[in-house]
């Protein structure tokens, strides 16, 4: 069993699974939690949206950008699901506190993160695939002709993590809650090894 309190994160701070423990039970105050965690089908959907998009970019079929198209890649692998990443992501999602947690690395590697939430009054929750598409759509603001890190990462940083070539694994956590008649789906995806290292390449261009 991993002692998360002993993990030293690249960015410092106390590990999420030490600070909150490893229980994924929601801690959401006045929000009425309708569901937490992901079904097998939802996990597969998240993986499929990521890998379809990674292959689309790798093949040079992504025409969007500022300017587009995005150049093809020669080292883009498919991501695989990692339960440890998912559990740590779920501990954080279950705090219902929208934002990034500081320390979520594993013994194996530093960990990156994408977050999204969507709220609707339509008494239903958006699918996780819809939330992942929000990250994908940031490609429209991405300029491939300058160094990737010179882009505005507030606008494009989820996209760059999604297609970061050296990332191999993903695990996500989710909470669906209701507050004041708003139905909110909050999704946290953790990636290992982390992307968005300024001195490394997004991917090898073909």
From Swiss-Prot:
Domain of life: Eukaryota
Sequence ranges assigned to domain SCP in this UniProt record: 47-191
PROSITE patterns the record matches: CRISP_1, CRISP_2
Keyword entries, A-Z: Allergen, Disulfide bond, Secreted
UniProt GO cellular component terms: extracellular region
Alphabetical list of InterPro entries matching this protein: Allrgn_V5/Tpx1_CS (IPR018244), CAP_dom (IPR014044), CAP_sf (IPR035940), CRISP-related (IPR001283), V5_allergen-like (IPR002413)
CDD domains in the record: CAP_euk (cd05380)
Main subcellular localisation: secreted
Disulfide pattern: 5-18, 9-103, 28-96, 172-189
Cell location: Secreted
PANTHER family: CYSTEINE-RICH SECRETORY PROTEIN-RELATED
The name this protein goes by in its record: Venom allergen 5
Organism: Vespula vidua (Ground hornet)
